C-alpha cells in the first residue's frame, strides 16, 4: 500500500492507498516541533489503530510546505522506512506539470500536486481553490500547464485576526448563518465569514477564468482543503468538491517516479 502525506502549515493529512482506492485517511496537527522518531510514532499509531502494520507500506509520497517538518520526515523515511521507495515532491521530481512562472521553485509543492490531479481528473483549463491556512487559487491551462494563481488569507486566520483586533468581537463557530442579514453579532460574524469568503472565491475564479480562455464555461473549478466544507456550498463557481485532491495527486506523482 502507498502512504501519502500532505504537510501543511496547520495540519498534516495522511492517506493510505491500495491501487487507486483511498482506504483510509487521518489528520493531525502540524504545529509544535516533532522529531523524526516522533513522526514515526505518529504514523505507526495511525496504522495500528486501523489494524495495519509497517509491512503493509510499500511506497511513500509526500509534499510539504514546512521546511522543518520536511527535514524530519526525510530522516524518518530513512531511519524507519529505509527499504520503502519514497518520493518527496521537490525540484527534480517528475510531475508532468510544466510550470509557467517567473520562478518555478517558489511555487508550493502542494499547489503543483493539486494542479496535476485536477488536470488528470477533470482536464484543463481548470482552477483549483484550496481552503487551508491560506486560500490559494491555482490556474491550469488547457494543456495541463500550471500558469499561476493567487493567495488570500485563509478563513481561520482571518477570523482569528478579526477577534483579536475587534474589541467587541469574539471567536465563533463557523457554520452557515440563518440569513445573510443577521440579527445579532454572532450571526453577523458568520454571515460575513461564510458569504464573504464565498464571494471572494467567485470573484477571483471569474477573473481567472476570463484570463484562461474565451469560453469561461470550459473551466472546471475544483475545491479542496480542510476548510472547504465551511463555504463551498455557497460558492456559485465551484463545480467539484474533492477533499482528497492532494492525496490523489501524490499517488499520481509516485506512479510517475517509481
Swiss-Prot record:
Sites binding ATP sit at 6-13, 133
Q: Name one GO molecular function term.
A: metal ion binding
Which pathway? Cofactor biosynthesis; coenzyme A biosynthesis; CoA from (R)-pantothenate: step 1/5
Q: How is the cofactor bound?
A: A monovalent cation. Ammonium or potassium.
Q: Which residues bind substrate?
A: 108-111, 185
> Which cysteine pairs are joined by S-S bonds?
none
Q: What is its EC number?
A: 2.7.1.33
Q: Does the keyword Transferase apply?
A: yes
Name any one Pfam family assigned in the record.
Answer: Pan_kinase
List, alphabetically, the GO terms of the cellular component aspect: cytoplasm
Protein name listed in UniProt: Type III pantothenate kinase
UniProt organism field = Thermobifida fusca (strain YX)
